């Protein structure tokens, strides 16, 4: 994933991040578990004061770090550290009935499986190293644009 600085005449890559996207093929369809493609915007920024590794359920901090969960729960893909919730901006592609990224709860977030970053592993979200999502969260703003390529 690359963070671009866009000017009127050009775009320049400012930062690069290794990520994990869906284990399934890219897809904007509801219930596909694929990472949606196309133009999105950041619709919500969640977890500003949470410590690295904090687990979120239903977009709320649980009060427990991933390492504090029983091993059987750690085996699942936990949402950790920060959440940037995405809203699709392309009607009938990633916005609207049957394909809406916001309604699918598509996020950019930290993970308890950092060893799998760089491999397709998620259930549709974009997962990052916890340190990286915290750094990205510090510079991201509501309304910032995100373009997801296949």
Which residues fall in each region the model found?
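Solvent-exposed coil/turn segments that connect beta secondary-structure elements
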Residues: 7-9, 22-24, 45-47, 87-89, ...
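Short, flexible surface segments
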Residues: 36-37, 142
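A structural motif detector for short, solvent-exposed N-terminal "entry" segments of globular domains
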Residues: 1-25
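Generic structural detector for well-ordered beta-strands
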Residues: 18-20, 41, 85
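N-terminal post-signal-peptidase region of extra-cytosolic proteins
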Residues: 16-32, 64-70, 130-131
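Short beta-strand segments
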Residues: 13-17, 40, 104-106
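Exported/periplasmic cell-wall-interacting domains
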Residues: 50-150
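Short, well-structured hydrophobic secondary-structure segments
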Residues: 39-52
